[in-house]
């Protein structure tokens, strides 16, 4: 379980004031000295993550955040980073001290984003009036806090139980291939080994898709683009589904048997991580782009650009081939994502294998709130190749 990608783990974030004991609580929850602890306020200057497992829930990711009461120029920057963590959060642990206006504001902020919140009153070992404070927090925040001591582990099991109770009903139910495949289906995977393919290994979407197909007891054949015809000829019957790299969508479409359905890894991840229906609807905004338009391309991972880079080279080339060279394209990566999306006519996101579903959906909602179309690499490439209505998802 330690090898479960962070993107597939339940994201549990701790929020609270500086020196409220968030870092000590992370250490208590993990049973390790994961985070530096100090009585000096503001020790945590950046979000810190720690992968762990909570039985019987499974793999989780704890996120320790800077205090939301930080001050000064640097303090404001730290608070901004804490705010960005909200978009990734599946369950929030909010450390309260009195239930005052600031803590109520953060509770409301989290609830408005649809995030289940567990209130905690930490440092029970050092407070003479713990019971009275807990009643005060319950009265002001509308729910009782769990009384906790990170020092002697009081309340840790209660936190585990509360996390299980607050687990989103649909968490972990989303699958990569959905209802597209069934036991015994023959599936062909087309995986070009170009400059973008890491030497000696497969990229994460391919690995996860193969694992899921094995779990579903499908029969898998894989090949590079130039060996697709040979692969198809080796089969007694056409495959039920062909999953390809989006970059060779058109090539594979021209060679596939009429009986075989076609999709791509990126398109599958559009539904696995995001909102496939909004992505498909938004892809038609490509037809409305002009040289005066502005497009944002967002990558989840950070890497040195390559000559055949799909996000930085191939998609911009396809777009400008259609609209003209004047089309303005901005590219961001990792957690960098503009707070103000209003200048953009279209957003094109990668498959987001490195992000959890909650984070991708929060970006989609940010765009949708401004009525800005947002699609992903695979869906956009399918539309640009004129085959969006001929693929499955």
Language-model region placement:
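Conserved hydrophobic helix-helix packing surfaces used for dimerization/oligomerization
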Residues: 12, 187, 293-295
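Canonical P-loop GTPase G-domain recognition
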Residues: 113-118, 123-179, 186-188, 217-226, ...
């Amino acid at each position: 379980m330690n090898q479960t990608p962070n993107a597939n783990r339940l994201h549990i974030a701790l929020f609270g004031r500086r020196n409220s004991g968030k870092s000590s609580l992370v250490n208590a929850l993990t049973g390790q000295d994961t985070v530096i602890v100090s009585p000096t306020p503001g020790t945590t200057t950046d979000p810190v993550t720690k992968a762990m497992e909570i039985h019987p829930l499974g793999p989780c990711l704890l996120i320790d955040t800077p205090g939301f009461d930080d001050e000064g120029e640097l303090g404001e920057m730290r608070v901004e980073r804490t705010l960005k963590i909200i978009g990734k959060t599946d369950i929030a642990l909010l450390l309260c001290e009195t239930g005052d206006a600031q803590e109520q504001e953060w509770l409301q902020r989290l609830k408005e984003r649809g995030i289940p919140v567990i209130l905690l009153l930490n440092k029970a070992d050092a407070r003479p009036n713990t019971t009275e404070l807990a009643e005060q927090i319950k009265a002001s925040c509308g729910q009782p806090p769990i009384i906790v001591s990170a020092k002697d582990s009081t309340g840790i099991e209660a936190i585990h139980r509360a996390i299980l109770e607050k687990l989103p009903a649909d968490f972990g139910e989303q699958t990569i291939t959905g209802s597209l495949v069934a036991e015994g289906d023959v599936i062909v995977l087309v995986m070009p080994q170009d400059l973008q393919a890491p030497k000696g290994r497969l990229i994460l979407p391919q690995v996860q898709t193969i694992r899921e197909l094995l779990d579903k007891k499908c029969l898998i054949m894989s090949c590079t683009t130039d060996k697709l015809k040979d692969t198809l000829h080796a089969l007694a019957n056409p495959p039920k589904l062909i999953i390809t790299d989006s970059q060779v969508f058109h090539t594979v479409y021209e060679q596939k048997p009429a009986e075989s359905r076609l999709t791509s890894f990126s398109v599958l991840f559009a539904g696995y991580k995001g909102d496939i229906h909004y992505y498909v609807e938004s892809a038609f905004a490509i037809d409305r782009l002009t040289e005066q338009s502005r497009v944002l391309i967002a990558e989840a991972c950070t890497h040195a650009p390559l000559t055949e880079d799909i996000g930085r080279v191939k998609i911009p080339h396809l777009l400008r081939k259609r609209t003209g060279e004047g089309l303005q394209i901005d590219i961001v990566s990792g957690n960098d994502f503009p707070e103000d999306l209003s200048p953009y006519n279209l957003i094109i996101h990668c498959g987001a294998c490195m992000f959890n579903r909650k984070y991708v959906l929060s970006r989609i909602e940010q765009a949708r709130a401004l009525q800005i179309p947002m699609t992903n690499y695979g869906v956009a490439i399918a539309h640009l190749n004129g085959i969006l209505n001929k693929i499955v998802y």
